[in-house]
UniProtKB/Swiss-Prot annotation:
Main location: secreted
Annotated GO CC locations: extracellular space
A Pfam family recorded for this sequence: A_deaminase_N
Listed EC numbers: 3.5.4.4
Function: Catalyzes the deamination of adenosine to inosine.
Alphabetical keyword list: Hydrolase, Metal-binding, Secreted, Signal
Protein known as: Adenosine deaminase
Length: 516
């Protein structure tokens, strides 16, 4: 017995010794550290958005120039942090962005698609001001707030205690053109010279934000203007290097001078006809689709009305209607789970593109993210609170649910102050998470259709190491995660690639001339 015990103890000791040896940590070694550090750094670069792109020789040349400019801006920011553009409020640095060489390159760059933008917050403020020079336009001002309302009419609309109508042409003449237009501009966008101290919390900025839609309403819902406004945005979008659009809209009733009221189907028909007309006029324009996106402030009866409407639109415009969404401040509006029964009754051919997680709250409003993925949303609007939901994150990656990141919107609406702290930076660091960059309501912050958001993504959200490959991948993503069919995507990529090659060739020539 004892010999066996001794043998067993010796064997156990030997095994224990082997285990002890295997658990011995290597001594600290500088060369080993450098090797590990390089492995980690390379691995992080390999995981980031854009790492799958292989650049051509021409692209590499352009990329070197772009990265020299990026390095220069980043080093200047490191030296003087208060002057680093993405760490400041967009309104405070808009002029500096516009003069940035990086922005000028991004502005010219073919960026693919805008997948998140709203119907009456699209065009430049200059264009909206130009609309007020049209005939038959009347205005009134709220006696308490001074908020303007507009209406096109052959005769004066009916006056009320809070609304005394006068012709816009007379008001402009009486006040002086420059003064009138300056006051008007202040009610057409949130842009101001003291953005930090004005509207300091989420609710107050949202109140100001929603007020803009009220000023725009009577001005833009005049049927001839509605058509022109949409076509103008397609022009501005193309000038900004964007070839495709998926537009969210509430479909308000339109009117004309003869008293005709246009219903939802007629409004979508205007969108469709203008899109087809613009396609014929512009060979590089890929197209557009429409997402019906009414406000979320409805009861049980209201949501049934909305789902009935989207079914009718889907039957009438099966190829043009991309799907359905609910919009408005998530913190105040009804949660998705409250509408889930009615939403699940919609046919599966109607896709969802839900706004969700556009909030700083945790375990409250942001639970819309859980509802969105379990309802089968194809994309997530904003998804700012996404990283508070690990299960949702897992599903987003598995089902390739693209996150529509809108950096400037998130800053202006008080979710983030410094773009370097935007959670979208984590998405850019991990290519497994599908994402696109979009602009939300560019008109209301006097931004370009997409370029300003791309600039903030490149300089604020992205790593120092992320380069032209990231920008190219984001453009590709915008087409890949669109609601186009496979055939449409194939044709879209051909049109985009042709523009990309043209952009690279032109920029290469210009850089060569600078170096000579």
């Amino acid at each position: 017995m004892f010999p066996r015990l001794i043998v067993w103890l010796l064997a156990a000791s030997a095994v224990h010794a082997v285990l002890d040896i295997s658990n011995i940590k290597p001594k600290r070694d500088y060369e080993n550290f450098l090797q590990k550090y390089a492995e980690y750094a390379d691995d992080e670069v390999d995981r980031s958005v854009g790492s799958d792109i292989t650049l051509s020789l021409k692209e590499k040349f352009v990329n070197q120039y772009l990265m020299d400019l990026k390095t220069e801006e980043l080093k200047a920011g490191l030296k003087n942090p208060s002057q680093f553009i993405p760490s400041n409020h967009f309104f405070s640095v808009l002029d500096r962005i516009n003069s940035s060489e990086i922005f000028k390159i991004i502005r010219r760059m073919p960026k693919g698609a805008i997948l998140h933008a709203h119907d009456t917050a699209l065009c430049s403020t200059d264009y909206v001001v130009s609309i007020t020079y049209r005939d038959h336009l009347w205005q009134c001002a709220d006696p308490k707030t001074g908020a303007l309302q507009f209406r096109f009419s052959k005769e004066s609309p009916k006056n009320t205690d809070t609304c005394q109508w006068t012709p816009v042409s007379e008001e402009r003449k009486n006040q002086g053109e420059e003064q009138y237009n300056s006051k008007l501009r202040s009610q057409l966008s949130l842009y101001n010279t003291d953005p930090i101290n004005r509207s300091r919390d989420v609710d107050s900025i949202w109140n100001d934000f929603m007020g803009l839609f009220g000023v725009n309403f009577g001005l833009l819902t005049y049927a001839p203007v509605w058509k022109d406004y949409y076509k103008q945005f397609l022009k501005e979008m193309m000038e900004d290097g964007v070839q495709y659009l998926e537009l969210r809209g509430t479909l308000p009733p339109l009117y004309d001078l003869d008293g005709k009221i246009y219903n939802e189907e007629q409004v979508v028909e205007i969108y469709y006809n203008v899109t087809e007309e613009f396609k014929k006029e512009n060979s590089t324009f890929i197209g557009a689709k429409f997402i019906y996106a009414p406000v979320r402030f409805v009861n049980a009866t209201g949501i049934k009305t909305l789902t009935t409407t989207v079914k009718q639109l889907h039957e009438r415009f099966p190829d043009f209607l991309a799907g359905f969404d609910l919009v408005g401040q998530e913190d105040k509006g009804g949660p998705l789970i409250g509408f889930s029964r009615e939403l699940l009754e919609l046919p599966e051919s109607i896709n969802f593109f839900f706004h969700s997680g556009e909030t700083n709250w945790n375990g409250m409003t942001d639970d819309n993210l859980i509802a969105a993925v379990t309802l089968g949303t194809k994309r997530i609007g904003h998804g700012y609170a996404l990283f508070k939901h690990p299960r949702v994150l897992k599903q987003v990656k598995k089902d390739k649910i693209a996150i529509e990141v809108c950096p400037i919107s998130n800053q202006v609406l008080r979710l983030v102050a410094d773009m370097r702290n935007h959670p979208g930076s984590i998405l850019l660091a991990n290519k497994k998470y599908p994402m696109v960059i979009s602009s939300d309501d560019p008109s209301f912050w006097e931004a370009t259709p997409l370029s300003h958001d791309f600039y903030m993504a490149f300089m604020g959200l992205a790593s120092y190491h992320q380069d032209l490959r990231m920008l190219k991948q984001l453009a590709i993503n915008s087409l890949e995660y669109s609601s186009m069919t496979l055939e449409e995507k194939t044709n879209a990529m051909k049109l985009w690639e042709a523009e990309w090659e043209k952009f690279i060739k032109e920029l290469e020539t210009e850089v060569f001339s600078l170096l000579e």
